[in-house]
């Protein structure tokens, strides 16, 4: 009896070969599908159904299995990638010596860039072009299935070398050590939590690569990777926009990536690209309505979402700050208007990182506060940028109203009010914050220099509408105050020479160049201006350029996009 059962079992289950064969063609029975077992296809009943004692049924009307989840989306993205790359591939030859990211359009005179400055850029430190080996374009005969996807780039950037987990960890740590103290828009624990996961949505991958881009720029060990990181981040940000759903919600990580890329491009003196990238961030901020996070019409934020909400506040205010700095530098209209903002100022970074964010004040409250409840150098920078933005807006508005023949409010009264507010903020900086010489804090140093640069910017606004000022003696007096502010900037800048270049705020060139241009423009009115200018230029020779540590801030003057800076460079180079 036992031998008969063994023989029967052996007949039902023939011996399998030692090597694994491909799965049998044909349909599995319903019982095997339900139990997720491999069906042997025996008729009239398969082995599993015989052992289970159930009826063996095969559904011949079942629809064939379709592609895996996400396959079609990935395929569409790859097709879009190839379609975008193919036109550029035919231009690799003629464009091998031209980089649109760094070379300005010489026909545009609004930003003061000239042909001579363009030629100096191409000779000084040209950024990588699309024809570099590590970022080579695919062959036109490459199939869609072989196109590189962004999901695999974390393991291999540009085919140069694999990005191991150890390198990723070091780049993340470099970012939080050298970049985050100046650009405090990421919650470290939250970022590292999802950064370790292999499966990420596109916006988070873009942010991760933007983090690595800035980290590698400020690293001697990984600096050779920065161009590949940068190109991959920009390309994927563009692809996610072109191939995605135009009505899909925007992620905070996408805005963070654009802000970091704009900062990187500013540090590399890719001025036009920095402006365009910053503009993307500003529009996405408006699209997400981050200017009304704390609107009374919105429900209270759940406790579980406090960190995420605080991170959104920081993203908004960093975009706001960047918008005002670029507008100050180029005399542009402000994009993010302070008068429609209903988002509280960010909490101090220590409380934010600990997961216990303090509820900040509204901008309109903080700007008039004489005794701040919490101290935050970044908030001081935001307030100072707001004062400069108001001065810029008043000057632009006054000029337009004068052209239209409209009655404009008294310029002197408006300027006096801004000057009183600025004087109050400078007193708060000196009383409630340590001196930059006592502590090595890039944000604190930037806040102190930004405060003095604001005095210069207010004088610059006054000089632009000097015909509207009632009392000429007041203009002379404010010019003297601006000169005193420039003296303080020179003293603070001298302290920066004692720090490593990665301890200096990435946007520090903006207020320093503003000071240099002010001294240069007024050098004929008093010998003190020229003397101070020469001292500042000497400090520029000692300050290392993050774009190229072998060069100094003098090189940034050469790559500047304003007429005053380029005139200063020409005169300085022709001097005996």
Swiss-Prot record:
Molecular function in Gene Ontology: DNA binding; DNA-binding transcription factor activity, RNA polymerase II-specific; zinc ion binding
Inactivation phenotype: Leads to a large decrease in the transcription of pksCT and ctnC, together with reduction of citrinin production to barely detectable level.
Gene Ontology BP term (one): DNA-templated transcription
Region (Disordered): 1-27, 102-148
Polar residues: compositionally biased ranges: 137-148
Localization: Nucleus
A single cellular component GO annotation: nucleus
Keywords: DNA-binding, Metal-binding, Nucleus, Transcription, Transcription regulation, Zinc
Composition skew (Low complexity), residue ranges: 114-124
Highest taxon above the source species: Eukaryota
CDD domains reported for this sequence: fungal_TF_MHR, GAL4
Pfam families the record matches: Fungal_trans, Zn_clus
DNA-binding region(s) in UniProt: 29-56
Stored SMART domains: Fungal_trans, GAL4
Residue stretches in coiled coil: none
Function of the protein: Transcription factor that regulates the expression of the gene cluster that mediates the biosynthesis of the mycotoxin citrinin, a hepato-nephrotoxic compound to humans due to inhibition of respiration complex III.
Protein name: Citrinin biosynthesis transcriptional activator ctnR
Organism: Monascus purpureus (Red mold)
Gene: ctnR
């Amino acid at each position: 009896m036992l031998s008969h059962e063994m023989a029967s079992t052996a007949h039902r289950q023939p011996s399998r070969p030692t090597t694994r064969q491909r799965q049998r063609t044909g349909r599995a029975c319903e019982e095997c599908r339900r139990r997720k077992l491999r069906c042997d296809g025996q008729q009239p009943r398969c082995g599993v159904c015989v052992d289970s004692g159930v009826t063996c049924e095969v559904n011949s009307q079942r629809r064939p299995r379709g592609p895996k989840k996400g396959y079609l989306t990935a395929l569409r993205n790859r097709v879009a990638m190839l379609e975008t790359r193919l036109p550029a591939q035919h231009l690799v030859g003629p464009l091998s010596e031209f980089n649109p990211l760094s070379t300005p359009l010489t026909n545009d005179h609004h930003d003061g860039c000239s042909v001579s400055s363009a030629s100096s850029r191409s000779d000084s430190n040209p950024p990588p072009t699309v024809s570099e080996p590590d970022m080579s374009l695919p062959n036109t005969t490459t199939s869609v299935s072989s196109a590189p996807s962004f999901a695999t780039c974390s393991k291999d950037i540009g085919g140069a070398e694999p990005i191991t987990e150890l390198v990723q960890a070091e780049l993340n740590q470099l970012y939080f050590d050298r970049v985050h103290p100046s650009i405090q828009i990421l919650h470290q624990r939250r970022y590292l939590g999802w950064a370790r996961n292999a499966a990420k949505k596109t916006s988070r991958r873009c942010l991760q690569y933007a983090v690595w881009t800035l980290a590698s720029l400020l690293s001697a060990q990984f600096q050779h990777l920065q161009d590949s990181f940068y190109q991959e981040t920009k390309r994927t940000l563009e692809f996610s926009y072109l191939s995605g759903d135009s009505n899909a919600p925007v992620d905070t990580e996408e805005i963070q990536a654009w802000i970091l890329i704009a900062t990187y491009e500013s540090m590399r003196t890719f001025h036009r690209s920095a402006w365009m990238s910053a503009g993307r961030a500003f529009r996405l901020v408006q699209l997400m309505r981050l200017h009304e996070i704390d609107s009374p019409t919105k429900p209270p934020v759940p406790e579980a979402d406090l960190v995420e909400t605080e991170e959104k506040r920081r993203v908004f205010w960093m975009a706001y700050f960047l918008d005002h700095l670029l507008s100050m530098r180029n005399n542009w209209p402000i994009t993010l208007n302070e008068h429609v903002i209903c988002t509280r100022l960010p909490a101090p970074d220590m409380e934010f990182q600990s997961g216990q964010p303090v509820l900040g004040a509204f901008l309109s409250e903080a700007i008039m506060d004489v005794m701040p409840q919490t101290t935050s150098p970044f908030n001081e920078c935001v307030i100072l940028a707001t004062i400069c933005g108001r001065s810029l807006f008043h000057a632009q508005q006054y000029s337009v109203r004068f052209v239209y023949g409209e009655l404009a409010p008294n310029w002197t009264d408006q300027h006096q009010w801004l000057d009183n507010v600025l004087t109050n903020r400078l007193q708060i900086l000196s009383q409630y914050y340590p001196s930059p010489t006592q502590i090595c804090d890039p944000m604190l140093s930037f806040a102190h220099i930004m405060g003095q640069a604001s005095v210069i910017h207010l004088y610059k606004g006054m000089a632009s509408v000097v015909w509207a000022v009632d009392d000429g003696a007041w203009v002379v007096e404010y010019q003297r105050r601006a000169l005193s502010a420039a003296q303080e900037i020179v003293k603070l800048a001298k302290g920066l020479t004692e720090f490593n270049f990665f301890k200096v705020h990435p946007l520090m060139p903006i207020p320093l160049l503003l000071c240099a241009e002010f001294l240069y423009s007024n050098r004929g009115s008093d010998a003190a201006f020229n003397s101070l200018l020469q001292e500042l230029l000497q400090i520029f020779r000692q300050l290392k350029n993050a774009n190229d540590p072998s060069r100094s801030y003098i090189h940034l003057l050469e790559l500047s996009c304003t007429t005053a800076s380029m005139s200063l460079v020409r005169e300085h180079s022709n001097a005996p």
